[in-house]
Design a protein with these regions (language model features):
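Intrinsic-disorder/low-complexity signal
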Residues: 1-191
């Protein structure tokens, strides 16, 4: 059992924290409301190719969940959730390796609101993204912006040659802007 270091919260946009891991990294979305939020991880490979790992409910493809045994070495846990403390909702992505990834983009999507065209913010969801590494790093970025939009680009992970930086992005976007600004996001918009 890994004993985590004290949690570090990145509160300001572009604030960053270094971390390492050697085979097990958990990225969790936790939130208090009953809103159906989706955790997604999009990425740019070192060769410039874009991809993503997200719920298979978007395109009805099991492969969208990813894999820990082969590239991308990232797996969205789907409905297999770890129990949470405090009765919070949880979605989780596990990462075995980021060796081939240059940058990972961690986003939340309020899919139902996007489909219905509702104006929404993330301020009342009580959300945050937590990152826990097997090197005992424990980082969090709050997802509580009052800006309107269906996509919340919470943070990014930058690969710095085996050391990593978690960067607070705190950027709320509409679907079209996310499509244009987040590499790999277009995957959930297409079959």
């Amino acid at each position: 059992m890994v004993t985590l270091k004290k949690k570090i919260t990145l509160r300001r946009k572009v604030e960053q924290a270094a971390f390492t891991f050697s085979g097990k990294l958990k990225v969790k979305l936790l939130w208090k409301s009953k809103t159906d939020l989706d955790l997604c991880l999009f990425y740019t490979k070192k060769n410039g190719e874009a991809g993503g790992v997200f719920s298979n409910e978007y395109r009805q493809k099991r492969s969208d969940l990813g894999s820990l045994e082969k590239f991308p070495y990232i797996l969205h846990m789907g409905d297999k959730k770890e129990p949470s403390k405090n009765n919070e909702e949880v979605e989780q992505i596990n990462i075995a390796s980021l060796d081939e990834i240059d940058t990972a983009y961690i986003c939340l999507i309020n899919y139902d609101a996007a489909i219905e065209g509702e104006d929404v913010t993330y301020a009342k969801e009580g959300g945050r993204v937590e990152l826990e590494s097997d090197s005992e790093d424990y980082l969090e970025v709050l997802a509580d912006s009052e800006e309107e939009g269906h996509v919340y680009w919470v943070c990014s992970i930058k690969n710095k040659g085996g050391e990593y930086a978690l960067i607070n992005k705190s950027k709320v976007l509409d679907i079209e802007t996310a499509f244009n600004e987040i590499p790999g996001f277009s995957l959930i918009c297409n079959d």
